């Protein structure tokens, strides 16, 4: 996923949860306008990695394009993601909150737009998040017999464009 982070929960309570995490659209708009705002400029994402407090979390990295590096300074973690190799590291977050990092390898023109947002929750809140996320993913699962309306298809296409295409082609499609 070029200039995005993909997260797959492979084991444990969240097993089966998977998503892409990319720079929040509002952050990209601030950057394009040359008007940075807020303390977490270029660090907010559309879908943070959510982990339980006090548990060992294993991060497995790889890449399919160039070398990246998953780095969150508050956890003392930096692991390179190298095409063709599987690498791992771990951390244990001891307090709840939002923690930020970035790709720590100069990986191309969108390198500055690869933030990492880890949301650490107490165990009971994490369990509730997992349950909600599994329900959300189940609701998104396509019914092969569903007949899509034009409005539904347009809405889905706009969401895909905003998440995957607008970074290069601009929100107005004229990039």
Model regions: which residues?
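Non-transmembrane, membrane-proximal soluble domains of secreted or membrane proteins
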Residues: 1-166, 171-174
């Amino acid at each position: 996923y070029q200039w995005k982070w993909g997260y797959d929960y492979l084991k444990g309570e969240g097993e089966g949860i998977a998503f892409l995490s990319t720079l929040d659209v509002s952050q990209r708009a601030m950057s394009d306008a040359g008007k940075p705002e807020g303390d977490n400029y270029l660090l907010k994402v559309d879908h943070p990695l959510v982990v339980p407090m006090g548990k060992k979390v294993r991060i497995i990295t790889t890449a399919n394009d160039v070398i990246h590096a998953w780095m969150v300074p508050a956890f003392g973690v930096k692991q390179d993601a190298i095409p063709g190799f599987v690498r791992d590291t771990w951390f244990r977050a001891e307090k709840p909150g939002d923690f930020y990092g970035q790709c720590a390898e100069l990986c191309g023109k969108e390198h500055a737009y690869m933030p990492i947002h880890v949301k650490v929750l107490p165990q009971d809140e994490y369990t509730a998040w997992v349950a909600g996320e599994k329900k959300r993913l189940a609701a998104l699962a396509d019914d092969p017999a569903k007949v899509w309306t034009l409005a539904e298809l347009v809405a889905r296409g706009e969401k895909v464009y905003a998440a995957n295409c607008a970074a290069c082609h601009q929100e107005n499609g004229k990039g």
